[in-house]
UniProtKB/Swiss-Prot annotation:
Known partners and oligomeric status: Homodimer.
InterPro entries the record matches: Archaeal_FAD_synthase, Cyt_trans-like, FAD_synth_RibL, Rossmann-like_a/b/a_fold
Species this protein is from: Pyrococcus furiosus (strain ATCC 43587 / DSM 3638 / JCM 8422 / Vc1)
Positions of transmembrane segments: none
Binding site for ATP: V14, F15, H19, V20, G21, H22, D100
Pfam families xref list: CTP_transf_like
Enzyme nomenclature, EC number: 2.7.7.2
Gene: ribL
Keyword Metal-binding among UniProt keywords: no
Family as reported in the entry's similarity comment: Belongs to the archaeal FAD synthase family.
A molecular function (GO) term: FMN adenylyltransferase activity
Name the UniProt record assigns to this protein: FAD synthase
Length: 148
């Protein structure tokens, strides 16, 4: 009898002001397995890492992500860095990092192995290189268009 276990892929990110780059990233991540779970950064984490609060609260970002066909489930992360406890609960087979996320695949892999998590960690490439696919550039265009 064959193994019917689904391959679970986990990604994480802020996903504030959803754009086409996010959609391409989620599509690529979904192609790595059968089930895609997205961890949305907690508002406190966004504020600490980006130096500003998110435009949209985590609950709204999660709801928007749930509406994307590639996404099977969304959870809101805990404040702070990557939660090993959350990763353990999600039981990923693959953790896919975005091209602009500043985590080292090797360092993350080592940290996970120490905790008994054997997920593959990979970095997905940019598929859509454009200022239209960067939240900071979108915010800048909004300010230039409507505030000057």
């Amino acid at each position: 009898m064959g193994d019917n276990r689904k391959v679970r892929v986990v990604v994480g990110g802020v996903f504030d002001i959803l754009h086409v780059g996010h959609v391409h990233f989620l599509k690529m991540a979904k192609e790595l397995g059968d089930e895609l779970i997205v961890i949305v950064a907690h508002d406190e984490t966004v504020k600490r890492r980006k130096g500003r609060p998110p435009i949209n609260p985590a609950e709204d970002r999660a709801e928007l992500l749930k509406s994307i066909r590639y996404v099977d489930d969304v959870v809101i992360g805990e404040p702070g860095e990557i939660s090993i406890d959350l990763i353990k609960r999600l039981k990923p087979d693959v953790i896919a990092l975005g091209p602009d996320q500043d985590f080292s695949c090797e360092e993350l892999k080592k940290r996970l192995r120490k905790e008994g998590i054997n997920a593959e960690v990979i970095r997905l490439p940019y598929l859509y290189k454009s200022d239209r696919a960067k939240t900071s550039k979108i915010i800048q265009r909004i300010i230039e268009t409507f505030c000057e």
